[in-house]
Design a protein with these regions (language model features):
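ATP-dependent adenylation/nucleotidyltransferase module used to activate substrates
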Residues: 1-150, 161, 170-171
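AMP-forming adenylation/ATP pyrophosphatase catalytic core
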Residues: 118-351
Length: 351
């Protein structure tokens, strides 16, 4: 229970369906100062604990706060920093889902006798004719969260319930209001929970210290120096704002080269490609692919997706050849493949 309306209604729905429900909030803040900073925001700060506890009291279910500080620091915060130092743009929510919310929380839940964990994600889970579990799109495309769940394993899915996926956001709020839940109109959290001010570069500076590369050069693809940048952790592929380059035309970040501490600048057209390669592939609806497969692929969370052909490479990586070029496929982000409403799988973009 994050203290938000979605997980609160998920708990309520499951209780109504006859489940024995126990509310749990994950403690992930690293120290009291950080917890105070997050007191008015974030999904697992002090205010979230207060809200979740009030909901649990209203629903008359047991409620606990479980400490996952170590797991969160290792699998999410350190990963986030390391990826930026490599010139990548990570998605920490995907790492948190796989390694903290599911791997760690599920293991601890099973150890104390639970059969499932349940969340307030806008997604559904199906058992397919081939016997495998797969995430299915929620009924509301605007809130669909299947992209961030592609990395879950078969065992994790077999012990997971997602009751909110059958409803729209307005319906969830209406159910919460009807039940008198105190979080019925609580705003959705928009930022990364451990960077509540959205200042990624300052967070990385604090966490990585001397490992953070300093200022370097803006360059063209062929190496011509255009100016000086503040440090590669300030930039991501496709970025236009904040470059402060007097070019006389709109220019964008087209690549980041951590090995030379350079940020490559180019035109918007240079950001488009019809081929995207990914690694660390997790298959969900199928065990593997051996032949080319037609899919709808999304290259970022809010991407509507484009159709393409998926081909498995000899080294296990997967190449998607898109029918229409996609813009700013960013190393470190996930590419998630869909067949119909189901997640076929996904991986981390490398090229």
């Amino acid at each position: 229970m994050s203290g938000g309306v979605d997980s609160s209604v998920a708990a309520m729905l499951l209780k109504e369906q006859g489940y024995d429900v126990i509310g749990v909030t994950m403690q992930i803040w690293q120290d009291e100062e950080e917890a105070v900073k997050e007191a008015n925001g974030g999904c697992c700060g002090l205010s979230a604990v207060d809200d979740a506890r009030r909901v649990a009291e209203r629903l008359e279910i047991p409620y606990y706060v479980m400490n996952f500080k170590k797991e969160f620091k290792c699998h999410v915060m350190d990963y986030f920093v390391d990826e930026y130092l490599r010139g990548h743009t990570p998605n920490p929510c995907i790492a948190c889902n796989r390694y903290v919310k599911w791997e760690s929380l599920l293991q601890r839940s099973l150890e104390i006798g639970a059969d499932y964990i349940a969340t307030g994600h806008y997604a559904r889970i199906d058992r397919l004719p081939n016997g495998r579990f797969a995430i299915r799109n929620s009924v509301t495309a605007a809130k669909d969260q299947t992209y961030a769940l592609y990395n879950l394993t078969q065992d994790q899915l077999s012990h997971t319930l997602m009751p909110v996926g059958e409803y729209t956001k307005d319906e969830i709020r209406a159910l919460a209001e009807e039940a008198g839940l105190p979080v019925a109109h609580k705003p959705d959290s928009q930022e990364i929970c451990f960077v509540p001010d959205n200042d990624y570069a300052s967070f990385i500076d604090r966490e990585a210290g001397e490992k953070v590369p300093g200022p370097g050069n803006f360059v063209t693809e062929d190496g011509r120096i255009l100016g000086h940048h503040k440090g590669i952790t300030h930039y991501t592929l496709g970025q236009r704002r904040g470059l402060e380059l007097p070019m006389g035309e709109r220019v964008f970040v087209t690549a980041i080269r951590p090995e030379t501490n350079e940020v490559v600048i180019g035109s918007n057209q240079e950001l488009f490609t019809d081929k995207v390669l990914c690694e660390n592939v997790n298959y969900m609806a199928v065990e593997n692919i051996t032949e080319p497969v037609r899919v709808l692929a999304k290259i970022r969370y809010n991407h509507k997706g484009e159709y393409g052909t998926l081909t498995r490479q000899q080294d296990g990586r997967v190449l998607c050849t898109f029918d229409v070029p996609v813009r700013a496929a960013t190393p470190g982000q996930a590419m998630v493949f869909y067949q119909g409403e189901h997640v076929l799988g996904g991986g981390t973009i490398v090229l």
